[in-house]
Amino acid sequence: MAEIGEFLKKYAGFCGLLPPSVDNSLLDFLANLPIILVFLITMPVRFFICIFAGLAKVNPICVLINLLPPLAIAIPFVTAQTPPVCSTQCQYCQSGKGECLNYNPTIAKYFTQCEKQLSVLNKIFCLVGIIIADVLNPILAFINPLIYLAIHKVICLNTNPCICGL
């Protein structure tokens, strides 16, 4: 129990209900209202990350870095990419070398430190992302042309209605 309390004290800024500097006065609270709203909206995700980080005894930022790529895979309409082949390795690093193709050496080292502890979690999220992408891709392929036609019709009606074919 003491370890969890120490962990929460160490990462109180990320794992707290409110940002650390907004509980001093009403003026601070009102000045930081947009940040507070973002904090409250992201509370379920932060709760999951902090609980997992506490159980695995790793930095919550490490968990967040490792969750973002699989979460992006799980939302194909945001990334507009097909999911890559899953592996149990960190997706961005060459194992053991700490070299990442798209990141500077400091971030590359951080990924490599996170890799061993969270590779199973990456695998699970990646597999879930592939399943979601497989389900959503045909639906999106059907919906996208309809949205394009609707937007085209609205633009046409607003610019020159006499040539829209009505």
Curated annotation (Swiss-Prot):
Subcellular location field: Host membrane
Domain of life per record: Viruses
Membrane topology reported for the UniProt record: Multi-pass membrane protein
Segments traversing the membrane: 35-55, 60-80, 124-144
Cysteines paired by S-S bonds: none
Any one cellular-component term (Gene Ontology): host cell membrane
Protein name: Putative transmembrane protein ORF166
Organism name: Acidianus bottle-shaped virus (isolate Italy/Pozzuoli)
